[in-house]
């Protein structure tokens, strides 16, 4: 089994423009009174929180003009996966047990934002971390325990705050089959 790091296509654009600050203002009234919306959104991947329950009814996004030129059906966006409808239809059964689908629109076109809520178990002995003057920085190599991730086509790592996504060859093959 091969594992891959999911990253945006080099020199590409995110699918949608998502103004997180204005979004935070919209969801603040729906959050518990002691929860700051900006902190909630900053920590959503690490805390494995649901976004679906707070998604404002009728909230729409906009396609980024550069994205429309590339016209991909999938966009990896800081811990989320944005899917156009044909990508969603092709991948929904594979992704459904791993997170939540948030149906919305971008410029009137139906799209789905996938909030991954599945962690892979890291193999700490094989992970490598960068240090500066003895202080830990980012991980430069992440390894996972194969028995844990073999049935998780897409997953995230606690070592990266949950915002970097990883996948198995099963997910990669599913994407390749429909050429998204």
Locations of regions flagged by a protein language model:
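Phosphate/anion-contacting hairpin/loop surfaces
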Residues: 1-180
């Amino acid at each position: 089994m091969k594992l891959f790091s999911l990253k945006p296509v080099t020199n590409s654009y995110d699918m949608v423009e998502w103004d997180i600050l204005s979004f935070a203002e919209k969801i603040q009234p729906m959050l518990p009174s002691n929860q700051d919306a900006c902190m909630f959104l900053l920590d959503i991947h690490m805390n494995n929180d649901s976004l679906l329950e707070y998604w404002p009814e009728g909230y729409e996004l906009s396609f980024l003009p550069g994205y429309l030129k590339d016209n991909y059906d999938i966009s990896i966006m800081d811990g989320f996966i944005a899917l156009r409808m044909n990508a969603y239809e092709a991948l929904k059964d594979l992704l459904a047990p791993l997170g939540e689908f948030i149906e919305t629109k971008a410029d009137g076109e139906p799209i789905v934002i996938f909030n991954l809520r599945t962690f892979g178990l890291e193999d700490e002995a094989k992970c490598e971390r960068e240090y500066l003057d003895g202080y830990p920085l980012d991980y430069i190599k992440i390894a996972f325990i194969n028995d844990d991730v073999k049935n998780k086509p897409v997953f995230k790592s606690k070592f990266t705050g949950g915002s970097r996504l990883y996948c198995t060859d099963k997910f990669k093959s599913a994407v390749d089959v429909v050429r998204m």
